[in-house]
């Protein structure tokens, strides 16, 4: 069936190859240096180089210079590990929005957590629905929001998937699809077994057991 593309939530870049390091891990390592009072400019610039290569490869006109200045400043001010981990999603969302010509919505302005660290579903749904009603198309980073203390907070594992479902609910989407870099479910871990066969039909119960 045909699909209309309205709201897009975006994950950050992963590994470019099996020997590569994920951006999240690079950000964690960089923040650890900042938290310990060590020099972190060089590893931070390595992260920027990865994003610059994406910008150049796609022929985008956007620049992330100011964003990285802000990240550096916030790292020095100990913005927190959640803030560090979320920056990959944030930066990639900016690039995707520029590439698609969509509006960029920072998740920290529309996804809220309460004082206990749980999703404030009612506030999030209300604010997000209003924001989405004001724009035709938007890119929203997954994985994070803002805590009651005003600091960036991340969801637990699978947070990008959760963000997608939150956005789908807020805009009353008739269909929400979660795409990954693997085509379906496989009978074995492809990192261990070469060319494992796909599972064509599987129940939710069976999937949960996997």
Map each language-model feature to its residues:
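Single conserved hydrophobic/aromatic residue that forms the stacking wall/gate
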Residues: 1-6
